[in-house]
Swiss-Prot record:
It comes from Orientia tsutsugamushi (strain Ikeda). InterPro entries: Ribosomal_uL15, Ribosomal_uL15/eL18_sf, Ribosomal_uL15_bac-type. Belongs to the universal ribosomal protein uL15 family. GO terms for molecular function: rRNA binding; structural constituent of ribosome. The keyword Electron transport does not apply. The keyword Nucleotidyltransferase does not apply. This is Large ribosomal subunit protein uL15. NCBIfam families: rplO_bact. Binds to the 23S rRNA.
């Protein structure tokens, strides 16, 4: 076997149709497009429905993507309480982005972090949890705080470093 004797099997490569090369080719003159009309002359525009108002124009405009949207990683005080109970946060710790990344509590490091206080409808902090938080003397260095979170942190004797 030599390189100059190699060839493809029958049907391995299909030849492209040569259109517009005379009547005898089978695809001459109108080139398989038929006679006259919009489709014989050029492509029909995308979304064109034959003169009927296109779907894209029939539907109302809806919404947009805000350029100024702020993406936050949400951290709840109950999550921090669980970390305290699991001995992952010690006395006097500064809770910031680096600590939360180290503990794998954040999805993305590029987003800002917002601290929320416990949602009264789902999980409520009991007196044991509150006393545990006050003993630890935690300091928070996060980007944003909910109003109730900031108020309760200061009330319990913990510190908000920024904002």
């Amino acid at each position: 076997m030599k390189l100059n004797t190699l060839f493809n099997l029958n049907g391995a490569k299909k030849c492209s149709k040569r259109i517009g090369r005379g009547i005898g080719s089978g695809k001459g003159k109108t080139c398989g497009r038929g006679a006259k009309g919009q489709k014989s002359r050029a492509k029909v525009a995308r979304g064109f429905e034959g003169g009927q108002t296109p779907l894209i124009k029939r539907l109302p405009k809806r919404g947009f993507k805000s350029m100024n949207k702020r993406n936050y990683n949400i951290i709840n005080i109950i999550t921090i309480l669980r970390l305290v109970k699991a001995n992952k946060i010690e006395y006097g710790a500064v809770i910031d982005k680096l600590l939360l990344l180290k503990l794998k509590m954040l999805k993305k490091s590029i987003n800002k972090i917002k601290l929320l206080w416990a949602n009264p409808s789902s999980l409520v902090l009991n007196s044991e949890d509150i006393s545990l938080l006050t003993k630890l003397d935690l300091q928070f260095n996060l980007d944003e705080y909910s109003i109730s979170a900031r108020k309760n942190i200061i009330k319990l004797g913990m510190k908000v470093i920024n904002n």
